[in-house]
Amino acid sequence: MSDAMQLAYDTLQGRVDESAQPSDWFEITQGRINDFADVTLDHQWIHIDAERASTGPFGTTIAHGHLTLSIMGHLPRAVEQNAPRLEGQKLMINYGFDKVRFPSPVPVGARVRTTSTLKRVEIKGGMIETMNEIVVEVEGQEKPCCVAESLGRLVF
């Protein structure tokens, strides 16, 4: 292990269980939902048919769970604070998720934001692997809409 990688590992180990500041709020519009439906070919009525959804279980259209998951990359502030660019780091790659849950829906027009807590740091495959618990909340809603254990690998 290089000196830079060891220093980065030690730095991140000291930040385990630290939570970052929440990201900025991000609005989930019907246009964004429709665009996501087109890209993923998931045109289920609960997402795109406002008239039918108005009589459905949520009273309106809702975002796809995977749309919520995918915008975690757009709301990087929380993640970047827990995995800052470290000396000698070439890049950070998305390695996947250990666990993903969608406890509540995201109604059209809602605003969401993320908070990230660094939970684990390990050396794997010549890289530093981090696991962040990311919570996506909906403004004014008690339950989060997504809780995920996101894995990243820092390349040195």
Where do the language-model regions lie?
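HotDog/MaoC-like acyl-thioester-processing domains
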Residues: 1-15, 102-156
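Hot-dog-fold acyl-thioester-processing enzymes
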Residues: 2-93
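Short, surface-exposed secondary-structure edge patches
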Residues: 59, 97, 103-104
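Short coil/loop residues immediately preceding or within conserved phosphate-binding loops
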Residues: 92, 97, 129-131
